[in-house]
Design a protein with these regions (language model features):
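Short glycine- and Lys/Arg-enriched binding-loop motifs that mark or flank ligand-binding interfaces
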Residues: 4, 48, 67, 83, ...
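A generic structural micro-feature
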Residues: 2, 81-83, 101-103, 201, ...
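Single conserved hydrophobic/aromatic residue that forms the stacking wall/gate
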Residues: 1-8, 12, 239-248
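Internal glycine-rich, Lys/Arg-flanked active-site/core loops of soluble domains
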Residues: 13-97, 102, 107, 111-112
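N-terminal targeting pre-sequences for secretion and organelle import
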Residues: 116-240
Length: 248
């Protein structure tokens, strides 16, 4: 797929075999012209550039963008082989609070620019991710005891609350210990420490392609001046075509 930006092009390759739902949907939208004249509406330096909001077509300079959709989502298609190194294409989505299944937006996507990380930084990130997983287990257990917690709070039973907290924390640790710990692969460590990326997104957003030509176009968009909503002040349109079907 080719993306034009003021007559400058980049070439994107889909991961056809591994992410078929995202592949088929992306091709469908490109063929239907859904992306034509849409904007790169969200740009964050050392992170990513985002596009695909249908509402960005002919949008005013003050319009708040990023909420447009095509009326459906796509089930997540996570694959450990594909991670958020610089240049990959991934599906945007709503947050975990309203989207615990991590389903992808039906149309919005982003291209990672990211930054480089040292190995100690990546190790610290691994630890943080594992801590967050344990916290999520604790929160899930706590929700199962909400009535009990409410009664204790109403009665001012602080000792009972602390005892229950200790019990739930122990249960969460036990459950976490049974799960495989998150670890970056040697390939991820090499990529994130040399070309860079956004490792904190791994396993949470579906990666389904990458830029194979014209990364300088992405780099130029990334450094564009933006407003307080991260929207570029200078307009960058997208125009996607299908000159060639790529396969891996």
């Amino acid at each position: 797929h080719r993306v034009d930006r003021r007559q400058r092009q980049m070439c994107i390759r889909d991961r056809y075999n591994e992410t078929p739902k995202h592949r088929d949907n992306f091709i469908k939208l490109v063929k239907e012209g859904v992306y034509d004249s849409t904007l790169f509406h969200r740009v964050i330096k050392q992170f990513m550039i985002q596009a695909g909001d249908p509402d960005s077509k002919n949008a005013s300079d003050t319009a708040m963008l990023g909420s447009g959709d095509v009326g459906y989502t796509i089930p997540a298609e996570f694959n450990p082989k594909f991670f958020h190194k610089k240049g990959v294409l991934a599906a945007a989505r709503q947050g975990d609070d309203v989207n615990p299944e991590k389903a992808s937006s039906g149309c919005q996507f982003y291209i990672v620019t990211g930054r480089k990380f040292t190995e100690p930084q990546l190790l610290g990130m691994e630890n943080k991710i594992n801590e967050q997983r344990e916290e999520a287990l604790f929160d899930s257990l706590a929700r199962q005891h909400m009535k009990e917690i409410y009664k204790m709070r109403k009665a001012g039973d602080n000792a009972g609350l602390l005892e229950l907290q200790d019990t739930l924390e122990a249960q969460a640790r036990e459950l976490a210990d049974k799960e495989e710990k998150f670890r970056f692969t040697p390939e991820q460590i090499k990529a994130y420490s040399t070309i860079g990326g956004a490792p904190h997104l791994d396993g949470s957003y579906t990666v389904f392609g990458e830029v194979t030509e014209g990364m300088e176009v992405v780099d130029n968009i990334e450094i564009a001046k933006t407003n307080r909503a991260d929207r570029p002040i200078a307009v960058s349109y997208t125009h996607l075509t299908l000159p060639t079907i790529y396969s891996v």
